[in-house]
């Protein structure tokens, strides 16, 4: 049998191990390095404007391991959006809208940071002494984990306001696919609201989700 003296030591060791596991599980998010959008299978090239938009799904291993939060388990589809501007003038994407349209005609708009966070943090609105992560109240015992989740979502989301000449910008779109049948097979992602330097809106981007690039969530 273990002596009473050894029990406190074992407890301390176990606590240290659990602490290390927790720190590892919620490591700082490191975004993937984007290539030129023209190199991805799922893309739409606007030759006249010299702008290409592409997507890459991050809903299955090994790619989804860059996240600490298993978004697919919460019914959320993470999609890396890559936009390359090979022209000589900047383009504006601050009012860009993204929509996922499935073969079943479901139309899903990209989620805001708070929408993603509420799902993965499983917000409990009954807390009597809430603290806040971003604009959202949380009970104290959830706050540290939730802060890591919120920081990851904020760091991951596509947040560029413009794509400068001869530059590539990237970031994640998040879609709520909970309960949606075949959300990726045969689906398309549409981008609207992209404007040139003169304020003129470009023709919408229609990016097919290619089957080889689309692991089902």
PLM ranges: what are they?
Residues 10-20:
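Bacterial N-terminal signal peptides
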Residues 22-217:
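Conserved functional micro-motifs across diverse proteins
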Residues 1-12:
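Bacterial N-terminal signal peptides that target proteins for export
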């Amino acid at each position: 049998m273990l002596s009473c003296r050894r029990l406190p030591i074992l407890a301390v060791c176990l606590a240290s191990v659990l602490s290390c596991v927790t720190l590892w599980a919620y490591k700082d998010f490191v975004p993937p390095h984007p290539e030129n959008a023209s190199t991805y299978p799922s893309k739409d090239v606007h030759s006249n404007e010299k702008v290409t938009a592409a997507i890459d799904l991050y809903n299955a291993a090994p790619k989804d391991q860059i996240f600490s939060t298993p978004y697919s388990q919460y019914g959320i589809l993470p999609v890396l959006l890559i936009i390359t501007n090979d022209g000589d003038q900047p383009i504006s994407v601050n009012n860009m809208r993204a929509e996922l349209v499935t073969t079943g005609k479901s139309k899903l708009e990209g989620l805001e940071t708070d929408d993603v966070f509420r799902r993965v943090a499983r917000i409990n609105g009954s807390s009597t002494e809430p603290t806040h992560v971003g604009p959202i109240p949380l009970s104290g015992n959830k706050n540290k984990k939730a802060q890591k989740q919120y920081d990851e979502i904020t760091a991951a989301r596509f947040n560029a306001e413009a794509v400068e000449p001869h530059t590539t910008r990237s970031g994640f779109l998040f879609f709520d696919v909970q309960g949606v049948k075949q959300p990726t097979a045969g689906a398309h992602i549409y981008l609207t609201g992209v404007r040139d330097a003169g304020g003129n809106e470009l023709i919408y981007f229609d990016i097919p989700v290619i089957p080889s690039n689309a692991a089902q969530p």
